[in-house]
Structure formats: structure tokens, C-alpha cells
Amino acid sequence: MQFRYVVTGLAVVMSLAGCQRTSYDYNNNGSNNPGYTPPLQAQPVPSVQSGALPPPDGASGSQFPSAPASAAPGGVNVASAAPPATALDVTKESMVGNWRVSNGGANCDMFLTLTNLGSGSRGGTRGCSGELTAMGSWEVSGKMVLFKNRSGDTIGRVYKSADARFDGTTNSGQPLSLSR
């Protein structure tokens, strides 16, 4: 007999032996087994009261703070600002792929595709915070790349500052950089 048949037979026997029931008695009443714990009995549930909660102490009419203004300090909407004169030309095809994003000191990933979505192309982020979490599409407009949320509103824009680098801002004025 060949050795491989012996090994195969032993493996089958060992596997079947492992499938055998243990000697533990699941119907044990505890008299023979000192480690047996009886099951817990169901307890009645008290009735539930319903009603409006009182407002917290010192609360105003709204529990949420007011939304920040859409314009940056100085009254200029940063996302609608024109690119600098030193901005390089950009094509849609050169943007496709994975980008490393630096947004206000935090890093995350951005993925850009050529799949049509509304007036732009599909895109998304992973690990980002703030406005970039809502990114759903992007498009090239002149020398700028616009990032849009799922509603189609521009949430940020960048311009090409070097061969594999883009710089710009989000609508809230946070600095935004893309690099490969």
C-alpha cells in the first residue's frame, strides 16, 4: 500500500472521530454535574410610559447650532474663486484613478472614474471627513476640477499646480491638495 493512501485514510478516520458527539449530557438536571447551571426563568416586564421629554436646562429653541456661512472670511466664496494664472491645463483623462487627499491636515483617498453621473463623472472618497464625505461626482471646468456632492452642488475645487499635484479649497475654505 502506498504511503499517501495510509495518510489519507488516517486523515478521514481522525476527521470522523472529531465529528463524534462528546460525552456531555445536555439533559443533565445538575445532580450529577457540579458545573451545571440551570437556565434562567423569564421575568415580567414592567409597563412602558410615553410622553414628551422636557427641554434640557439652558436650551434655546433649537438643539443644533446654526450652520456656518457658505462664504469664507472676507465675503468671498472660496469655491467660486478663479484659478491662479500659474494653473496648468488639465484633462479629464489625466484625473482618472486613485488620489491621496490632504484636507485641512487630515489625509484620505479619492477615486475618480469616467462613468457618467449627472453632468459630471462618478467619484468618491474613503476615510475623508467634512464636506468630502458627500462627494459623488466631479468634472473639469477650464483649468479647474470641481467636486460635487450627490445633489450636484459644488463642494470644492482644485487646480493643477504640478505634474501630479492639485491644490485648491473646499466650500468651507479648508485647504485641499491631491497627489499621486
UniProtKB/Swiss-Prot annotation:
Subcellular location, record wording: Cell outer membrane
One GO CC term, this protein: cell outer membrane
Protein topology in the membrane: Lipid-anchor
Lipidation (N-palmitoyl cysteine): C19
Keyword Membrane assigned: yes
Signal peptide range: 1-18
Start and end residues of each stretch annotated as Disordered: 28-78
Key words of the record: Cell outer membrane, Lipoprotein, Membrane, Palmitate, Signal
InterPro entries in alphabetical order: Inh/Omp19 (IPR021140), OM_lipoprot_Omp19_bac (IPR010571), Protease_inh_b-brl_dom (IPR016085)
Record bears the keyword Signal: yes
Protein name, entry field: Outer membrane lipoprotein omp19 homolog
Natural source organism: Agrobacterium fabrum (strain C58 / ATCC 33970)
